[in-house]
């Protein structure tokens, strides 16, 4: 398996193509993610970025191409056609462009929902209140609370998620995704709607997740300051095609990217 300066390959996407009727939303896109990386996927609205995420995470089955994961210490596996919950259980988690929390549940309970894919308690054990069920529930609470501390939400663990400010809800979604113990985390526009201070805090949080949790990150984002600050590599899409890939500096200087997305001001 290939490796770069960070580590072994975790995600390998080749020839990914997605058709909706007569519309080709993604056209022959390839992408690799390696251990220890933060990688950004950028491009104009409608470029196909979220559709790409949906194909990789099992919401859509690609028309053509292959999506393959290489879990650390595990066997390489083709995941085309797998259900999203199965892909999550294999170690690839995501957040969504539109926040998808459970508003009538507490902040802690929202994270615990994510953690339950790592428990093995049966329905019978849960109903009977077995020792195993009690032990796993306590472990779930403790793990979830630790994740809330990591994202700065431990003090509001008992609040309903609907009462959180927008930026805090974004961080709660990240905590819930981390509760699944992923080796790769996909973030779909995590800074959307955030003010500059919240975006600055998110910048630090994403880097901490990579460094402390040993989780690689693939993110879609329009905030170019955030992208350029934290990314090891960047892929650029336009009209469903990949038009460039490289380091932040290479992307800043790429004429195709400047014309399609960044503009001359970003290059200056």
Show the residue positions of the predicted features.
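Glycine-rich phosphate-binding loops of nucleotide-dependent enzymes
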Residues: 2-268
């Amino acid at each position: 398996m290939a490796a770069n300066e960070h580590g072994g390959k975790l995600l390998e996407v080749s020839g990914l193509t997605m058709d909706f009727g007569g519309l080709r939303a993604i056209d022959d896109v390839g992408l690799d993610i390696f251990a220890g990386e933060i990688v950004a996927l950028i491009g104009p609205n409608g470029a196909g970025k979220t559709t790409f995420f949906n194909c990789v995470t099992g919401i859509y089955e690609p028309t053509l191409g292959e999506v393959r994961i290489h879990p650390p210490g595990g066997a390489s596996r083709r995941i085309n056609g797998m259900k999203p919950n199965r892909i999550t259980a294999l170690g690839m988690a995501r957040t969504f462009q539109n926040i998808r929390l459970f508003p009538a549940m507490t902040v802690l309970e929202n994270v615990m929902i994510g953690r339950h894919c790592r428990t093995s308690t049966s329905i019978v054990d849960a109903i009977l209140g077995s020792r195993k069920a009690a032990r796993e529930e306590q472990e779930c609470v403790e793990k979830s609370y630790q994740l809330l501390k990591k994202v700065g939400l431990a003090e509001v663990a008992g609040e309903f998620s609907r009462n959180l400010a927008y930026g805090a809800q974004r961080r709660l979604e990240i905590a819930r995704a981390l509760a699944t113990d992923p080796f790769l985390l996909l973030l779909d526009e995590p800074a959307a709607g955030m003010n500059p201070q919240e975006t600055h805090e998110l910048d630090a949080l994403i880097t901490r997740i990579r460094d402390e949790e040993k989780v690689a990150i693939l993110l879609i984002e329009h905030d170019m300051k955030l992208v350029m600050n934290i990314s090891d590599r960047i892929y650029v899409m336009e009209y469903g095609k990949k038009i460039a890939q490289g380091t932040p500096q290479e992307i800043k200087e790429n004429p195709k990217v400047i014309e399609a997305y960044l503009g001359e001001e970003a290059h200056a």
